[in-house]
Amino acid sequence: MKKCMWLLAFCCSSAIAIAQDNDHPDSLLLRRQLFVLRNVIAAKGEQLSERERLYYQAYLDNFFNKGQTSNTSIDLLLQKYRADLTAKQVSELLQVKIDNLVKAYRYKAAYTSSMYLLDSFKTTLPEKDQAAIRNAAVIWEGLQEIAPQELTVVQDTHVPFKRDAVGLVNIPVSIGDTSNEFVFDTGAGISTITESSAARNHLTPMNKYFDVEAATGGIVKARIAVVKELKIGGILVKNAVFMVFPDSALTWPEAKYGIKGIIGFPVIEQMGEIRINSKEGLLEVPQQPLPGSYANFGLSNLRPVINVAYKKDSLPFIFDTGATATALNAPFFKKYRKEVMRRGKPFRLPQGGAGGVNTVNAYRLPEIVLGIADKKPRLPHIPVITAPVMEEDRYYYGNLGQDIMKQYREMVISFRYMYVSFND
């Protein structure tokens, strides 16, 4: 089940002339192949000019969760080389800067930068991008006077979780004196709560509405509410931002299933490291995250991305603990079309999340073997969607779900050191 994300477009395209070579840095950036781009830039080393290094590093540091370093590169690039950049390049760099500001909870600066971008690049930004920036600015405007989110882990924490009727991880969340069971979902950009749950937890949504793109491609009207304090086991979170959805957007009557709330990326990321122990039903958050030997994890806006190997190829996948099963996207179908059509059987795939359910054309492969870090999970009956439903489906080859996570005793996600690993 893919989750929604609001319409804050992350435009990675470059206005530098795109070479035909698929391994050219500009082509890799355009196709959001950031894991490959990292290796290419490291190999080129001194062959790159300072302007080129700053340019590519701004995107790479944004992707690998080094927002402050990314913004330092952007500021220096605009200070020293703005005359060498096109208006399109500058506008896209400013969008990266806004994303870094949002991840640092600097909402006022994000709003100011958004307004500057809209005022200064009217003739450069496509109308679709302007609408997305304007839509997201509604959120940042409402949060201008809100203090940054704070999350405190005073000791190694173990939080028991339950799986609901569709297999999603639900954790206990306390808001004031009210106890809740919310879905724990790395694929949710901003934490989400239904209108009835917001009222039950004495939350007051802000007045302005903004648009959220649902997994079906439809639009949900949402508002923002700020939770002054919430607790997840012994973890205290202050000033957590929630999107407030109409109950109908998180209810599926035909399945007799509904979601009251979702703990999403901003809260999960600030935990530093999480360990989901499927065998014991425990969410573990260590006080001190542990370094890893590789970095196979990145962020596209607030969407986790993981590096996956298939055959000899390195492919970026969305990494979504709120997805019950793995699905392969349109880029996978395009790249391996002959194999998919030869081995697979066509069918209509129900697909949905916050906002409803739709069906899309797909093929079902009997089995596929993927490479993730040092593991090679086998996935039977895997669907391959033939056309993009959401914008991100144009770039990411699949959406990893819980069918992979359940094959291992423990899954580790480190936002501090940017890796994902699985332990038997």
Regions found by a protein language model. Give the residues of each.
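Pepsin/retropepsin-fold aspartyl endopeptidases
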Residues: 20-424
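Bacterial Sec-dependent N-terminal signal peptides
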Residues: 1-27
